Design a protein with these regions (language model features):
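Active-site machinery of serine-nucleophile hydrolases
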Residues: 69-131
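A domain-start/cap signature at the N-terminus of enzymes
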Residues: 24-60, 96, 130, 136, ...
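C-terminal catalytic histidine-bearing segment of alpha/beta-hydrolase fold enzymes
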Residues: 181, 188, 197-260
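Gly/Ser-rich "nucleophile elbow"/oxyanion-hole loop immediately N-terminal to the catalytic nucleophile
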Residues: 52-56, 111-157
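Bacterial Sec-dependent N-terminal signal peptides
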Residues: 1-29
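Primarily recognizes the serine-hydrolase "nucleophile elbow" in alpha/beta-hydrolase
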Residues: 139-192
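Alpha-helical scaffolding within the catalytic cores
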Residues: 79-89, 182-191, 216
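The conserved beta1-alpha1 loop
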Residues: 64-65, 202
């Protein structure tokens, strides 16, 4: 028998769920739909703009999604993590440009050689097509928007975490800070990015990307003279991006970074 309390609870839970969906949709709609085309290659991306103040420049965050959000709908890349940057509180406290590109099916943000299971990834000489397009897009955005080029940040989860390392090593003078989440990369090239303030996140129980990838990268960065931050969640598997991007200390740290 369903009592009145149960009915009220169900109604309340439905109301909360609907409110959350409406709130998420409202935040998603803040991101403009965009398409970057260069020499016949296309990169879909969404972009969030700060409230305009023509007297100042703003930081820019590049957000790289994971492999599950690949496609061409220009929507899936907003499912995980990036919406934390779009909250009213964060946008008010840290007004910035947020760029969320979408990687096409069967492509990657990174271009590595090696055996994934043995944690011996090696950076190839040329970037992947999606990464090349991101950098070309960024050049256009800097030309046409009030972007502070001393405060360009990059972050990503899983495949996007690997893409974050890839970008840092290929374009080490571009970024003011980086936040790779449950990612993997070429530890032999850690010295190239040792000067970039970096905060790494990983779940200790991650079955998809071995957390030892992060341990290895931290060790290599320290050996190269860096002082990376590291947060490991002891009871978390692959979904470490949920607590990582909800971390207000990380947000405060990220937006404080500026190239010297």
């Amino acid at each position: 028998m369903i009592n009145l309390f149960t009915i009220r609870s169900l109604v309340f839970n439905c109301f909360i769920s609907i409110a959350a969906i409406v709130s998420t949709n409202a935040q998603t709609e803040k991101f403009s739909f965009n398409k970057f085309i260069n020499k016949g290659d296309t990169l879909n991306y969404r972009m969030l703009f700060p409230l305009n103040d023509t007297l100042q420049k703003y930081p820019l965050v590049i957000f790289l999604h994971g492999c599950g959000e690949r496609g061409n709908d220009n929507e899936a890349q907003l499912k995980c993590g990036v919406m934390n940057f779009a909250s009213d509180q964060i946008m008010k406290q840290y007004p910035s440009f947020i760029v969320a590109p979408q990687c096409s099916e069967n492509l990657d943000w990174y271009n590595f050689d090696g055996d994934f299971n043995s944690r011996k990834m090696r950076l190839k000489a040329t970037p992947s097509k999606p990464m090349k397009l991101i950098i070309e897009l960024l050049q256009e955005l800097v030309k046409n928007n009030a972007i502070d080029t001393n405060r360009i940040y990059i972050t990503g989860l899983s495949m996007g975490g690997a893409g974050t390392y890839d970008a840092m090593q290929r374009y080490p003078r571009l970024f003011a800070a980086a936040v790779p989440v449950c990612g993997f990369g070429d530890v032999s090239k850690a010295a190239l990015m040792a000067h970039i303030p970096t905060w790494i996140f990983h779940g200790a129980l991650d079955p998809a990307v071995d957390p030892r990838y992060s341990y290895d990268m931290i060790g290599a960065l320290i050996q190269a003279g860096a002082h990376p931050g590291f947060t490991q969640y002891p009871e978390v598997d692959h979904f470490s991006w949920i607590p990582a991007y909800a971390d207000t200390m990380m947000m405060e740290w990220l937006y404080r970074q500026c190239k010297k």
